[in-house]
Amino acid sequence: MNYTQTLEFLFSSLPVFEAKGATAYKPGLERITAFCRHIGNPQRNFFTIHVAGTNGKGSVSHIIASVLQQAGYRTGLFTSPHLQDFRERIRVDGEMIPKQKVVNFVDKHHGKMVELELSFFEMTAALAFDYFAQSDVEVAVIETGLGGRLDATNIIVPLVSVIT
């Protein structure tokens, strides 16, 4: 698959909340937990700051990531939704995930994604965790999706939680 084909798979084969609304949301942490176990639990390889709340999550997440980066930490940032480019969601030290990393991850794991019926958000979170671990991130700032106790990002064990 190339990058365009990969995005077509992601947006057409996995339930996307922005396109399908509540029908894309499947409560529970079982799928993301099983998938992250399948890929080696990468979310355990770095410290996390978990950002939740009604408004301002993205702005606060970007500010925290910028401060950490300026302080010399190798920093991951996971936010949603993206505005123009899917890769905006996943950054290391301010740089978007390379297209080829997205393609390689989906090529390698798409069978398991389909088998577990991962949502688009669950897959995106797992991709971020995997990329952060591969990139030797020291601290990752993780923005919740829909929030609540069953949000896919709740498989992390945060060093700090922030509510906006």
Regions found by a protein language model. Name each.
Residues M1-A52, V60-H62, S66-A71:
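Short functional linear segments
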Residues V160-T164:
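Conserved beta-strand/loop subsegment of P-loop NTPase cores
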